[in-house]
């Protein structure tokens, strides 16, 4: 028995306008009504489901290339992090390179 449906967002669940069209919304609604957990997966940081046309659907999400997993209420369930000491060493070793950092609270950049 299938219990979960996970799919990438951009170019898969979302169209060129970065929205889920009616066909996708109906399919996701049917999956959730059948009892499946539908999990959008994305490289984006924490995902605001509503802005992509999924308003009213209880969807969990796998964000930041899998490093943040949150439930349908936005509660962070699990994070996988890089040791802060390693991050500090990288910033010192490569001062001219821009680093991006995703956290459950948002995105941060070194430059």
Segments predicted by a language model, with ranges:
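Active-site phosphate-binding/coordination module
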Residues: 18-111
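Detector for methionine-enriched segments
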Residues: 1-4, 107
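Asp-based phosphoryl-transfer active-site loop
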Residues: 3-18, 40
